[in-house]
Each structure stands twice: as C-alpha cells, then as structure tokens.
C-alpha cells in the first residue's frame, strides 16, 4: 500500500524551525517580541487597525464576547454549521445561542435568515467564513448597522481571504485561527483583528489576567509601579515560541494559498462529472483561501453514504475529514434544543466530506484521491 495521505498536514520548513530555535536561545520564550512582530506584520498584511494574538481562536471568541458584555439574558445569532466552540462560549457566558440555517451549497448564513432571528435580546451576530470563502459581508454589515448589533466574523477558515477589494479582517472585528490544520499554523494559536480602539484595549487586558501590560512589557518597564489588575481576566496569551512560527507562516502565506488554489482547481476539474457535489463558490467578487476542499456524498447520487465512503478511503490509505457535524446535533445541544430543525444544515451535516488538501501535496496526490473515489463510487453509482 502507498503511504497514508492525511487530509491535512502542516507546511513546516527550516525557516519555522530556525525561528523557534532562535526564541529558545533568546532568554525570553513566553509572550514578548515575537508576539509584537506577529501583530505588527498581520496589520501590515491585511490592513487591520489592531491585532491581538491569543492562544486559540476559541479564546479569542470568548474574550471578544466578554468585551462586548455578552451575558445572561442575551442572545447571539450564529449558524449551527460551525465548529462547536463558538456555541460553547456563548453558553458558558450564560447567553443563548440562536442557531440559524445556512445556504445549502456554500454553507454560509444569509442576511435574511439573520434578520428574521433578531429580537430585542440579540446582542451579537457571528457569521462564519466557510472553507476559505467569505460571507456576503455587505449584506451582513447592513443588517448589523441597521439594528446596531455588533458583528463578529469567525474567520478561522479565512486567513488570506478577500471579499471584493478588502481583506477579511480589514474592517470590523474578526477572529482568526492558527490551529495545526489552518492556512497559517503555529500548532495552537489565534488572533483578534478589530478597528475598534476600545474593544482592542479590552481584549488585550482580558487575555492576560486583566493587566494593562503583559509580562514582557513589565520586564522592560521594570516592576515599579507594579502593574495593576484593571478587571478579572484570563490566561489566553500566546507564547513567543508559537508566535515565531506564525510570523514565518504569515510571510509564506501567499505561496501557501496559491498552492491550495492550484490543488483545488485540479480537484474541480477532475470531479466535474462526478456524482460528488463540491461546495459552490460564492458568485460575488472574492479571493478564496481554500482552507478546505469539501464534497457532499449523497447516497441517492453516489450509491454509498458519507461514512462508508470515508471508511473505504481509509482502507486505501487516504484520510478525510468532517467539517463539521452541526452543533445542534451534538448530544448536549440536541437535548437542549430538541425541536430545533435546520434543513440545509442537517442535509449537509450528514453528507460533508473533506478531501486531502495541504500545500505540500503533489498533483499526483490529488489524482490518487480522485482515482480512489472513482473506484469506490463506480460500482455503487446510481
């Protein structure tokens, strides 16, 4: 059998390794100059006014919601078709997640469904940029402005994505992820981008115990006067070991995303006559980051269900993924919201399959996946 082909693998090279070695030898390995470099470089790359590095996108979402005062009695509108951490953070703050349906073919929310879910208790809207494509931000921003509700963009999949002539993260408040499978990775990490001065200052405090400065600032400035806790906060800062990797990855992002684009194009060309159904790309102007390449496996079209197809791929040494099982179908939320029915979300949740896509893949790897799919589906195809 050929070597196992995972659905994702981080593109880590000698530059990232050397950056970590330099930090380890610097005498300062926690939050420090590499964090500052990452935040500065991110703002320069994407036109952000403020960038605040954190230990994960989940942490970033948590303290952003906190900074906006989200709490008991509040409602936050977001899709169920997302990683469950966003829903968890809303619930842990005592607020109510109002989960809405998605477009069947792009997996993203539309403004009409968001508007229909707004009540007097709505305190935030969290759309998700999916698989590397952007939401229709103009329509969403118009709704948010009309009702004076904060918009928090979940861009865990969308570093290097453009909406029209703007980068995702250039305007408003946006949460990015640097998790191991993301387009930029530092193993674990995230970043909050915002053009709101007050929000930026607040999340910077909340990420580090509620202090006005971090440990590196206090070392440089000395400990007199002693830094004070302005408000209770968390330990969500990013170490410089992680930040150093992200700095290099950010420099490499154009080549990383270009390779992802080429691989996605090869998949699309090869699957044009397949009963598998790739996600649609939005019809508005955008630049896709191709974080994931996803297909829908419909048994009526393919003669085999998604789970069986994934098992067969594994048997021939090919990994695949599920991004994601809808949040409201998870045990806790299924029991909490037993009557919630989101048709497009549920249809996709039962059929989504993520195929291998990462920068170090060869064209022949794509061909191997496509050939395996044809072999598996061939005898079953309806």
UniProtKB/Swiss-Prot annotation:
The reaction(s) this protein catalyses: UDP-4-amino-4-deoxy-beta-L-arabinose + 2-oxoglutarate = UDP-beta-L-threo-pentopyranos-4-ulose + L-glutamate
Gene Ontology cellular-component annotations: membrane
Enzyme Commission number(s) of this protein: 2.6.1.87
Cofactor: pyridoxal 5'-phosphate
Superkingdom of the organism of origin: Bacteria
CDD domains xrefs: AHBA_syn
Signal peptide: none
A GO term for molecular function: UDP-4-amino-4-deoxy-L-arabinose aminotransferase
Cited Gene3D superfamilies: Aspartate Aminotransferase, domain 1 (3.90.1150.10), Type I PLP-dependent aspartate aminotransferase-like (Major domain) (3.40.640.10)
Pathway entry: Nucleotide-sugar biosynthesis; UDP-4-deoxy-4-formamido-beta-L-arabinose biosynthesis; UDP-4-deoxy-4-formamido-beta-L-arabinose from UDP-alpha-D-glucuronate: step 2/3; Bacterial outer membrane biogenesis; lipopolysaccharide biosynthesis
GO BP annotation list: lipid A biosynthetic process; lipopolysaccharide biosynthetic process; response to antibiotic
Keywords carried by this UniProt record: Aminotransferase, Antibiotic resistance, Lipid A biosynthesis, Lipid biosynthesis, Lipid metabolism, Lipopolysaccharide biosynthesis, Pyridoxal phosphate, Transferase
Modified residues (N6-(pyridoxal phosphate)lysine): 182
NCBIfam families with a match to the protein in the record: PRK11658.1
Family per record: Belongs to the DegT/DnrJ/EryC1 family. ArnB subfamily.
Record function comment: Catalyzes the conversion of UDP-4-keto-arabinose (UDP-Ara4O) to UDP-4-amino-4-deoxy-L-arabinose (UDP-L-Ara4N). The modified arabinose is attached to lipid A and is required for resistance to polymyxin and cationic antimicrobial peptides.
Quaternary structure and partners: Homodimer.
Protein name, as recorded: UDP-4-amino-4-deoxy-L-arabinose--oxoglutarate aminotransferase
